[in-house]
Every structure is written in structure tokens, then in C-alpha cells.
From Swiss-Prot:
Transcriptional regulator which is important for the differentiation and maintenance of meso-diencephalic dopaminergic (mdDA) neurons during development. In addition to its importance during development, it also has roles in the long-term survival and maintenance of the mdDA neurons. Activates NR4A2/NURR1-mediated transcription of genes such as SLC6A3, SLC18A2, TH and DRD2 which are essential for development of mdDA neurons. The gene is Pitx3. GO terms for cellular component: chromatin; nucleus. Highly expressed in developing eye lens. Expression is restricted to the substantia nigra and ventral tegmental area in the midbrain. Residues 1-71 are annotated as: Disordered. This is Pituitary homeobox 3. It comes from Mus musculus (Mouse). Interacts with SFPQ.
Length: 302
């Protein structure tokens, strides 16, 4: 009897039936409920005017309206943008108060304005890179052929020994030994070199007598000397030999000359010549007639 009652109870309530382990089985889902849910969602979507749930979700989103700025607002915003392209929060709030706008609108305007400014800068740089700097500078710099017509690059003869510069004439002449006219002269020239530069070339040779034109080039003869004395003095002048030796030494570029030794030698030579050259004695005053300092020659009337 008891087993029969248990079988009837299990048949009436299958959810309360126990398994062999003693755990209750979950109730099986009914297919009729799922179909009912799908039918309810289809009815709801059909009742919407768009006909699909996606259109309904798009309409539920709030669309942002486009802000229309007045000329005064744009002028104020542009002036502030020229002064500061990245305003902070307090500055944006002040601008919003001045322009009667919200801080969010001001922030968005500055963001868009910065993007526009960067785009313009990039386009200008791209134009400069495409055009390059050769076009504006091409009219300023003349071509190479017009600047240097005589120096055609790459057109030299194949067996030419001298470049085109050798055919050009220059106002100054180059020497193979002395490059410059003053290269052979020392920085501190001794008196011998100065005397050699002042003596004419005709007086450099010891056996020649310079003419009157050469003497006039030296400043003329002294006023107390006769022309004959002048002409003879050119040969017997004590400075002629020293000048000739200095000129001969200066004319030879292969002789090493020490400026200190040459100056000392010239000074010694001049001292010897001054010692040999004697001047006439100057006559002194006539001697007194044996008179003491306290005695005076007084003429007495006769």
C-alpha cells in the first residue's frame, strides 16, 4: 500500500521526484513560454512607428543642436584666440560670460579653431615644400655663364698645360722666388735697407757716376756744394759703399740675411767711416790781450 501511494505522488508531482543520489531534478523548461516571449517582442516592435527596435534607440538619443554664433561673439572669440590658443578653465568661463555662451560651447569652439589653424599651417608648409626655394631665388642669382664668361667649366683643351687664369693680365706681377713685393724685406728693416731703397740704381755700382736727374730725385744737392763737388762726391761719399753692399745683398734672394747682424755690421761700418771722415776745425774767438777779468781796456783821451 505504501509503495502504491508513493508511485501516485511521484506521478502527480514530477519535480519532487528524487534521484538515486537523493538530489531533486530541476524542472524542465516549457517551450510554450519561449514562444510567448518572442511573440510579445514582435508585437512591441510592430507597434513602433519605425518598424525596428534600432530606429527607436536612435530616436531616443538626444541630438545636439548646431550653435549659431553672432558677429560680436565671433569677434570676441577670434581676438582671444589670437592672444591665447589654449585658454584654461577660468579663461573659458570669463569668455562664456562675455559672449553669453556656455563654457562647453566655448571649449568646443576653441578645439575646432585650433584644428583649423593646424590644418592651415600644414597646407602652407606643403606648398613651400612643393615650390621650394629655387623659384624665388632663381631671379636674384644670375647664371654662372653670365657671371664668369671667360671661365667656362669643363671646356678646357685636353692637352692644355696652363689654366685660363694664366692668360689673364693682372696689375701686379708675381715673382717665382718672392711672391710679394715686400716678402724679402724683414718686418723691422735695418737702416742699411732703408739707405739701399733711397739710393738710385745708378749709384749701386761703384764705378758709375749718377747724373743730375738722379741727384734731383734725392732732394737735390746741398746749397754749399758746387756741381763739381757734387758729382765727385757721389763716388767718394762714405755711404755709397755701404748702400751698394746693402743693395747687392738685397738683390740676391738666395743669401740668408740676419736682420740683427746686418744692422750691427752697418752701424760698425758707419762708425768707422765717421771716424775717417774729418771735418775742418771751427775757429774760436780771438785771444784776449792778457787782461784780467777785472781789467778793462779803456781808451783815454789824449
Amino acid at each position: 500500500m505504501e509503495f502504491g501511494l508513493l508511485g501516485e505522488a511521484e506521478a502527480r508531482s514530477p519535480a519532487l521526484s528524487l534521484s538515486d543520489a537523493g538530489t531533486p531534478h530541476p524542472p524542465l523548461p516549457e517551450h510554450g513560454c519561449k514562444g510567448q516571449e518572442h511573440s510579445d517582442s514582435e508585437k512591441a516592435s510592430a507597434s513602433l512607428p519605425g518598424g525596428s527596435p534600432e530606429d527607436g534607440s536612435l530616436k531616443k538619443k538626444q541630438r545636439r543642436q548646431r550653435t549659431h554664433f553672432t558677429s560680436q561673439q565671433l569677434q570676441e572669440l577670434e581676438a582671444t584666440f589670437q592672444r591665447n590658443r589654449y585658454p584654461d578653465m577660468s579663461t573659458r568661463e570669463e569668455i562664456a560670460v562675455w559672449t553669453n555662451l556656455t563654457e562647453a560651447r566655448v571649449r568646443v569652439w576653441f578645439k575646432n579653431r585650433r584644428a583649423k589653424w593646424r590644418k592651415r599651417e600644414r597646407s602652407q608648409q606643403a606648398e613651400l615644400c612643393k615650390g621650394g626655394f629655387a623659384a624665388p631665388l632663381g631671379g636674384l642669382v644670375p647664371p654662372y655663364e653670365e657671371v664668369y664668361p671667360g671661365y667656362s667649366y669643363g671646356n678646357w683643351p685636353p692637352k692644355a698645360l696652363a689654366p685660363p687664369l694664366a692668360a689673364k693680365t693682372f696689375p701686379f706681377a708675381f715673382n717665382s722666388v718672392n711672391v710679394g713685393p715686400l716678402a724679402s724685406q724683414p718686418v723691422f728693416s735695418p737702416p742699411s735697407s732703408i739707405a739701399a731703397s733711397m739710393v738710385p740704381s745708378a749709384a749701386a755700382a761703384p764705378g758709375t757716376v749718377p747724373g743730375p736727374g738722379a741727384l734731383q730725385g734725392l732732394g737735390g744737392a746741398p746749397p754749399g756744394l758746387a756741381p763739381a763737388a757734387v758729382s765727385s762726391g757721389a763716388v767718394s761719399c762714405p755711404y755709397a759703399s755701404a748702400a751698394a753692399a746693402a743693395a747687392a745683398a738685397a738683390s740676391s734672394p738666395y743669401v740668408y740675411r740676419d736682420p740683427c747682424n746686418s744692422s750691427l755690421a752697418s752701424l760698425r761700418l758707419k762708425a768707422k767711416q765717421h771716424a775717417s771722415f774729418s771735418y775742418p776745425a771751427v775757429p774760436g774767438p780771438p785771444p784776449a790781450a792778457n787782461l784780467s777779468p777785472c781789467q778793462y781796456a779803456v781808451e783815454r783821451p789824449v
